[in-house]
Amino acid sequence: EEVRRRIDRAININEVCDVNPFGVIATMAAYNEGGEWLDALRKYLRGNYEYLCCFFKERLPQYPVLPLEGTYLVWIDCRASGSNSDGASSIGSDAMTLRLQEGQKLMVNSGTMYGPGGEGFIRLNIACPRALLADGLERMARLFYREVF
């Protein structure tokens, strides 16, 4: 009985397994009537990605933006930051992430969170209003210009 209780608690720790009537109705509405909304959302997110790409091309061209892979999470290659003579980054993605969070109040994810190969990359969520994205990119550029270059 104790094992059953522990398993049940582990499954329901975030209450994601419980179905409630409102969730069922919302899910049905999303599947049956959400096509236009989803199309508009995808178009808006594509616009945010294009805005970000233009921003980096014009203001931070040394940082390549990777193509989207079916999501709204953008990978930015920051390996050029403070490069040593051998081309390796002297500022790791963890340090850059911390500087963005503490100095600019901008939350990004360090590539190292995602395992080997992530060092030197940061991940940015662009599923937000464009004005918020623009503000975040300006803060990112401020930090890069002030501390990295």
Question: Residues of each region from the PLM?
Answer:
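Conserved glycine-rich beta-strand-loop-beta hairpin in the small C-terminal domain of fold type I
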Residues: 21-24, 28, 43-53, 65-81, ...
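Conserved core segment of the aminotransferase class I/II
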Residues: 1-46, 53-55, 144
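PLP-dependent enzyme catalytic core of the Aspartate aminotransferase-like
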Residues: 89-95, 99-108, 114-149
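A short linear hydrophobic-aromatic micro-motif
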Residues: 53, 62-65, 107-112
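Surface-exposed helix-capping loop/turn segments at secondary-structure junctions
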Residues: 36, 56-65, 148-149
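Non-transmembrane alpha-helical segments in soluble domains
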Residues: 28, 53, 57, 75, ...
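Residue-level recognition of strand-loop junctions within catalytic nucleotide-signaling folds
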Residues: 1, 32, 77-79, 127-129
